Amino acid sequence: MEANNYTPSLDKYQIPVVEASQGYHLVLASPGCGKTHILAERIRYARERGVKYEDMLCLTFTNRAAREMTNRIQKVVGGDFSELMVGNVHRFCSKFLFEQGRIPADSAIIDDEEAVSIIADYRNEDEEGVTRDFNRYKGYQTIIFFQHFIYQLEHQHPWKYYLHPESFTDDDREAVKHICASQKIEYDEQAVVNIYHHAQEYMDEVNAPGLDGKTADRIRVLLWKMYYANCYARYKEENHLFDFEDLLLYTYDIYRSDPTCKRYPWIQVDEVQDLNGMQLAIIDLLTAEDNPMVMYLGDEQQAIFSFMGAKVETLTLLKMRCKGNIHHLQRNHRSPKYLLDVFNDYAEKQLKIDRELLPLSDNDTKATSGDLRIIHSSTIEAEHKDITTEALSLYEQNKEERTAVIVSANSDADRISEAMTEVGLTHFKVSGRDLFDTPDVKLLLAHLSVLSNEHNSIAWTRIMKGMHAFPSHALARRFNWKLKQLALSPSDFLLYPESCYTAEFLRAYNEEEIVVFDTETTGLNVFQDDIIEIAAIRIKGGEVVGEPLDLYIETDKPILPMLGDKENPMYAIYHEKMSAGELLSPSEALQRFLAYVGTSPILAHNANYDYNILDNNLQRYCNDTMQAHDIRCFDSLKLIRLLAPSLHSYKLESLLETFQLAGVNSHQAIDDVKATISLVRLCAEKAREKQAQQEAFIHHPKVKPFANVLRSNYGERYREAVNRLYKLSTDHEPALVSELSAAYNAFRSDGLINDIPRLDYILRYLRIDMLTDETVANALAPQLSQYVMDINTLKEADFCNSKSILERIYVTTVHKAKGLEFDNVIIFDAADGRYPNAYNKTRQQDEEDARKFYVAMSRAKRRLFIAYALQKVERYGRVVNRELTPLMEAISKYFN
């Protein structure tokens, strides 16, 4: 590596990692060794040596880590790296399935609560009651996990890639064996699958003569689990719904069977110790066969996610795969030596890490009195107060420092938070139910989601429930399903009180002349780019009327010769027209187009784009607007999505092929208009078939009350927001933040949602930390397009390392603290029985608790306090004496 090309911050251990350009490599690094920085430097190094962004893949465990990686890449690399995929494995799978048309375009992703709601509907149980009851909720999760288990069984996945093998319990096995013996069939995988698909038919087995009660209970539990798991699977399939684990399973199966899927020659994977077997298998399938560059980065000391399927053995496997290319980052750039001595001694003695492989510090700052302390409290209750007092002291003495109280359970966080609140200590709690998982915040995000994509059925379901149109998500889902069968959209009830979108189109198609048009432009920015060709053809009843219009327009903006990896046909045509003197000025061409349209409705494929770039060109060159002409606009993309809702792609080229329509999608406006007319004729045929059913449904006396409530509670808010989608904001507030605030205020004043005291955290984070790309116009539509997917993956922990957070005291669980860093850390209740947990049943669980303790300690950058209570009052009033966790034995000498 040329030294003058690189920042001096790279140390001698990091440089070989950055330079690695082929083969499989494993980087093992403790916290503070600069992993995120070298990930970004590797991208710069590879890019400078000709690796294309679209051939790179950067994967990590959490969305938060992916966002941090993206921010670091922006600082190190700069420029436009939008072709570079940075995200967690689920994000990659979602992007692949949707963008590559591998699943229907109207598919939606459901979260855990929505999955529970679906099953609760089959069980005739109150979905909210289930969510509030931990034990019932856990039972529902078992059903969901079992459905994935059966999917993997049916698709013959290797056992090591099973996501939830524990969902098929020993009792389940005994139940299946009994059924097989009773039915005289062989006990094997196919028998399990067969019983699963016919669970109700085997219910009589429970009542077999002579069957003991224990076996009967086993069979009953298994068969009901199978029945509801099958119901859940069928519901998802029928409604094009995918839960998060489906994203992994479907992607794995597609990549396993289709050699044409894109493989990546350059991959780096962070936090590899947290990935489960299926995620690693997917990464292997994504890897190009011909001499790939794959870099894994991890830390076996921080492997604490076994409850999500991660295994410590993963690093053992990767060490064998990467033999000869294992790198140890041995310079810690974050922790002072006195803290690193604590971490390293602990890693060596408790985690059995070779001392030679542990990092040294480049920070020789000496510890001052009290930087490392053990806090002894008389009781748990006293410990809450003592920790609060300590946190308050740190807060008052060190105005720039941040302090975290790290706990092992959500209930601990609640009690610490209560103690801090009592003394007026402002703090931020990251534990328990996440702010982004609360119904009110989900409702606000659903509002943004339907503005971004009005075909998002899950978001509409949440809105219908939240607007009190339906009492449950289950009823709202059924209503949405019926709308889909009838080519109706929920927005029809808000925009067309006695009609619907397809009916309005059909009326115009039959009774009026429609101008079908298309534009070719210098780019995709509707606010800044120019139209260079505009073409139009009039039709009535599907027949062409009069002469076509095809105008070429001069521009001073560059025209790209290539559109991605394809030639741009407009490049040569435009320059031919320019040489022949056949280009019109923008004002003349636009005025001729408006004259051609007159008062007729217009139609385009993906009309939102064409209409709004036309509107902005009119403003720029004619001091005019589309709104001033009050021209109705239809969109063949919206029409065909309503009328044929299960297609995988709605690009014009794909639709021509799918329906065998006349025309060619050449990206020349006049050709695209002719192709769109073919599609419009098909839409009219399909709309005609639905019209009578639509009218009957819209005017049905049982439907009207629901529609009226939805219209009354949401119609005005929705219409106002839709009208603002492409309006540039004139103030400094991001348009998306303004819309979120306006929706909250409207819903709250109407009594539709409760106060959200912490909404300001979200608004500040969006304003200061997320909506930072200055190339994205300050209008709602482009900001939604750029950010809505990221917004829907936010968690409270994202706030902790952000610029927007004002608090300097945090209360967090160990798992949510992972990846964060604080000046001061106080570990709560570090007593024997909590670390390791007294309820652990295996050595592996004790070892994971030891790693959890390491993760908690290593969040500290300056001070580390270990707290515990000398006594605890148990449930029945018995006082129990307690000892400091035995995990402290190797390092207690450093404290006090």
Which residue stretches match the model-derived regions?
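P-loop NTPase Walker
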Residues: 1-106, 263, 344, 817, ...
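Conserved P-loop NTPase-based nucleic-acid remodeling module centered on helicase motor cores
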Residues: 55-172, 316, 632, 654-657
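Conserved non-catalytic scaffold segment of RNase H-like nuclease domains
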Residues: 512-515, 521-620, 626-627, 649, ...
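Helicase P-loop NTPase motor core
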Residues: 26-39, 323-325, 332-425, 579-581, ...
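Conserved RecA-like helicase ATPase core segment
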Residues: 2, 45, 277-370, 374, ...
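C-terminal accessory regions
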Residues: 682, 803-808, 831-896
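Conserved helicase NTPase motor core
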Residues: 7-19, 23-31, 65, 85, ...
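Accessory C-terminal helicase-associated subdomains
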Residues: 222-225, 453-515, 523, 538, ...
